[in-house]
């Protein structure tokens, strides 16, 4: 991962951006951008980059919480993995978007017209031969309004 590239990238990329690479946009985002640039019929949209994710972790202190949770896992007891996952999910849901990210997200949403949108996850490690995230990430359809968009993100 090129940390400098990520830390110097925008929070939002247009869906047809040439910058929408796997490290910045995840697999789905990068592939949708490629299709859009090739003039396939892809709905308008935008990509929230991995910079937004890393800034969210820093602003909320979640990186430390994740590392602390990982240090306490007992891999011999799968139920602890589920409990840790649920705990971290609650922490992520409770964390507010940093103001810069929220501002750019709001502007991108309004540029689309402020109507109902779909929010799709896009992992930077998905679709790799040695990893599979199929069915493990959420999709939110018919998300209407910035407050709901922020919650879905």
Predicted regions: what they are:
Residues 1-153:
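N-terminal beta-alpha lobe that positions the nucleotide/phosphoryl donor
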